[in-house]
Amino acid sequence: MFTASIGVFVFGLLAAIAGGAVGASIGGNYGFVLTGFTVLASWGILAATGSTFALDYLAFGPFMGPHIIFAGGAAAAIYARYKGYMDDGKDVNSPLAGLGRPDVIYVGAIFGILGYAVQIGIAKIPWFGTHTDSVALTVVISGIAARILFGGDPGKGLFKGSLHSSHLYAEGKGLMAKIKPGPNGRWLEWQERPSQLITIGSLFGIFAGGASLFLAANIGAHPTDLGFADGLAAANANNFCFGISAIIILFLITNRNMPVQHHVTNIAGLAAVQFFPVLMGKSFSTFTWT
């Protein structure tokens, strides 16, 4: 996509620099919310025109892709804590432009470059690149890299984070108790219990699976009439509920205990459109959706 030519690659690189900086400026979670809105708008473009351009280049590309805008914001937050500009490196809500420190925004831009390059690299791996979510995997890699690089106490230097500092672990405990997160290390306390996880996972999964099947079978008719592949809508149907889940993060930012389930709706929608054809005695590639 962004490797068609050197010019296209450089254009995407510049967009990734800006995307990471935007994520740092407005806060990683706000950036992710914008991803959600962009996904829904891009789906409207797909339904109207049959083109996945907006999904590929905007929603999941270097402009609003989570591996750029969210990952850049998350890395900048860890860096800001490392430099002593803020108290909590987990704070991916606060707009970091408010710190008045340009270096924080530059870190977001650098991690935008990292996300851009790593995602392209993963996508190019034979077989693996086409059988995994390269955007999501890049978010994980970027977060781990930022944690290792900046995760230490302020002023202690690079690569001296909690992954390296034994004093930050509980002494005299077994392995699991030793690494058990403290009061500030818990992200979603209301989603920790297995009963709650199963409830949210199953019901939001049904929600996303049903919506994805509806989009695949009904919205897909128009792109097919325009001459596009029959399974075009089905191949992107899981993104729709992912976008809704991303927007729900906006309400989480307002200190509401919202369910965080974008990782559920994305996979559930994908599973629905992949396995429904199997139930019909076909495969995804041979099933006729419209």
Where are these regions (language model features)?
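Alpha-helical multipass membrane-protein architecture
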Residues: 2-290
